[in-house]
Amino acid sequence: MTFVVTDNCIKCKYTDCVEVCPVDCFYEGPNFLVIHPDECIDCALCEPECPAQAIFSEDEVPENMQEFIELNSELAEVWPNITEKKDALPDAEEWDGVAGKLQHLER
């Protein structure tokens, strides 16, 4: 099993989760983070660290966000690895909690 970054990370990109990951399985796009499913060891350290509550265990991803399972896998293959915490995006607080942000995902 793996953990999955979902919709609410888009346009927020808090990186608190990256800092606690023991296997460095996070990958960074312009306005979103993903978890590489083959590298995640299912330790669950990242989930409570996410201020946006955007990380779920794969078997607990909400029904309306199932597409993020495949999206994490796909984008982790092309985006660079991130291993250190960075500042969140400048307007993260404004976007935190906004529903339906997939259309704003920058690849």
Swiss-Prot record:
Give every 4Fe-4S ferredoxin-type domain span. 2-30, 31-60
- Residues binding [3Fe-4S] cluster are 9, 17, 50
Task: Write out the entry's keywords from A to Z.
Answer: 3Fe-4S, 4Fe-4S, Electron transport, Iron, Iron-sulfur, Metal-binding, Repeat, Transport
Q: How is the cofactor bound?
A: Binds 1 [4Fe-4S] cluster. Binds 1 [3Fe-4S] cluster.
Q: Domain of life, per the record? A: Bacteria
Q: Which SUPFAM superfamilies match?
A: 4Fe-4S ferredoxins (SSF54862)
InterPro entries assigned to the protein according to its UniProt record, in alphabetical order: 4Fe4S_Fe-S-bd, 4Fe4S_Fe_S_CS, 7Fe_ferredoxin, Fd_C, FdxA, RnfB_subfamily
List the GO molecular function terms: 3 iron, 4 sulfur cluster binding; 4 iron, 4 sulfur cluster binding; electron transfer activity; metal ion binding
Q: Per the database entry, which stretches of residues form a coiled coil? A: none
Which cofactors, by name?
Answer: [4Fe-4S] cluster; [3Fe-4S] cluster
Q: Which residues form the signal peptide?
A: none
Q: Where does [4Fe-4S] cluster bind?
A: 21, 40, 43, 46
Q: What does this protein do?
A: Ferredoxins are iron-sulfur proteins that transfer electrons in a wide variety of metabolic reactions.
Protein name according to UniProt: Ferredoxin 1
Q: Which organism is it from?
A: Pseudomonas aeruginosa (strain ATCC 15692 / DSM 22644 / CIP 104116 / JCM 14847 / LMG 12228 / 1C / PRS 101 / PAO1)
